[in-house]
């Protein structure tokens, strides 16, 4: 099987403030929906993924429906959201913009957790080892997994990669991403 990968480099937070970097990611994703057909792609099979801040952006775009709606795209049209070690609370960069420190949690309109809902696209959370991860990242993702379940979401999965830290967890996460993309793709194509 062949995957087409669109790599988006997001804006640096030193130059812009929230929500500009979220909106920039949304514009790139909207471009994919609007143009993937020209490259032989299928809008029913667009998956989002990213590591760390990219994982945070993946979840913000996939869960807060207002962002893609500006482009007349329903966030539920995303085939699956597969963040690698993403913040599920408000990102520490946003908290820093608000004068907060790295370990002071916040769940507001800039937190994927704020938008836990039953009808979201499949969500596959992948993190490193709780003892090696950055700033409680595994625990944030475990909380997201639980809240999605409590919200009635039927397709949230959590993977914990023992022995891998925040930076090294990406390499062993890719086979899981491919496995999940293949499984979700099969489900989607079966419904067609």
What are these regions (language model features)?
Residues 2-6, 47:
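A fold-wide structural signal in alpha/beta-hydrolase
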Residues 3, 10-12, 86, 161-163:
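Active-site loop/turn elements of alpha/beta-hydrolase fold enzymes
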Residues 6-43:
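Catalytic nucleophile-loop/oxyanion-hole region of alpha/beta-hydrolase
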Residues 30-97, 107-108:
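Primarily recognizes the serine-hydrolase "nucleophile elbow" in alpha/beta-hydrolase
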Residues 72-94, 102-146, 150:
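The feature captures the conserved acid-bearing segment of alpha/beta-hydrolase catalytic domains
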Residues 142, 149-192:
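C-terminal catalytic histidine-bearing segment of alpha/beta-hydrolase fold enzymes
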